[in-house]
């Protein structure tokens, strides 16, 4: 159950970088959209959306912004037909990358994603070419844990699949459909995650050479900045000396 989680360190570092870049709202809006897309716009019947709304409110997001994101995901915006599209490909150093998009113009999105891959030395692959290297999971990250035993007991009682400890931090893994329920149960037990989301998690990380690190980081950043992109995940394991 316990063990060093290099992924947690990488994920948490990325979360801090995202905050510095002012991407918190973007990520919250995307989660509202995706949650509504998969579970509908009724927060009473959609625990993942309920959690996303709670997070957005905590960051003082306006009601209008939240409602538009939810309607966009649920397909309730007049005259707008949204389509989910997934792209898979490889970046420098053989890094596997999955890009999930929500778009009203598939041709535009394909062109933008392909351009990013091409410009940064990557290649788009066919459907399924890298997906087998990832698993969808709910992830809850705790930065400072005072009582590991209590957290482990609460997590397992809430239905978590696994929990990994690394020094004072902890990473709890759940099935995607149990993510919101586990989160809410842990809050009731007195544990609130510092970071949490449903994401694709690489089964194994792929080492990035120092020579390729900057280009891989640039590719991931370019993809994340595209308007139609909902999420970008990779199995990149950047060298410690890389400061990108």
From Swiss-Prot:
GO terms for biological process: regulation of DNA-templated transcription. Coiled coil: none annotated. It is found in: Cytoplasm. GO terms for cellular component: cytosol. InterPro entries: Integrase-like_N, TACO1_YebC-like_2nd/3rd_dom, TACO1_YebC_N, Transcrip_reg_TACO1-like, Transcrip_reg_TACO1-like_dom3, YebC-like. GO terms for molecular function: DNA binding. It comes from the Bacteria. The keyword Iron does not apply. Its main location: cytoplasm. It holds the Pfam family TACO1_YebC_N. Keywords: Cytoplasm, DNA-binding, Transcription, Transcription regulation. NCBIfam families: PRK00110.1, PRK12378.1, YebC/PmpR family DNA-binding transcriptional regulator. Belongs to the TACO1 family. This is Probable transcriptional regulatory protein DNO_1179.
């Amino acid at each position: 159950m316990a063990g060093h989680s290099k992924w947690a360190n990488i994920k948490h570092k990325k979360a801090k970088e995202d905050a510095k870049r002012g991407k918190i709202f973007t990520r919250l809006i995307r989660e509202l959209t995706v949650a509504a897309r998969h579970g509908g716009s009724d927060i009473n019947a959609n625990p993942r959306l309920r959690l996303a709304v709670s997070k957005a409110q905590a960051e003082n997001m306006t009601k209008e912004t939240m409602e538009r994101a939810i309607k966009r995901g649920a397909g309730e915006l007049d005259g707008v037909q949204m389509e989910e599209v997934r792209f898979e490909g490889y970046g420098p150093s053989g890094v596997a990358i999955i890009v999930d998009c929500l778009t009203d113009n598939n041709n535009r999105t394909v062109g933008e994603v392909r351009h990013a891959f091409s410009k940064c030395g990557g290649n788009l692959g066919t459907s399924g070419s890298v997906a087998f290297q990832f698993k969808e999971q709910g992830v809850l990250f705790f930065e400072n844990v005072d009582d590991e035993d209590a957290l482990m007991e609460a997590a397992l009682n809430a239905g978590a699949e696994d929990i990994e400890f690394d020094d004072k931090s902890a990473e709890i893994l759940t099935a995607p459909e149990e993510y919101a329920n586990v989160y809410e149960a842990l809050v009731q037990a007195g544990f609130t995650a510092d970071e949490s989301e449903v994401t694709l998690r690489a089964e194994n990380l792929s080492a990035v050479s120092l020579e390729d690190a900057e280009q891989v980081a640039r590719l991931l950043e370019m993809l994340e900045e595209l308007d139609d992109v909902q999420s970008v995940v990779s199995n990149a394991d950047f060298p410690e000396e890389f400061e990108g």
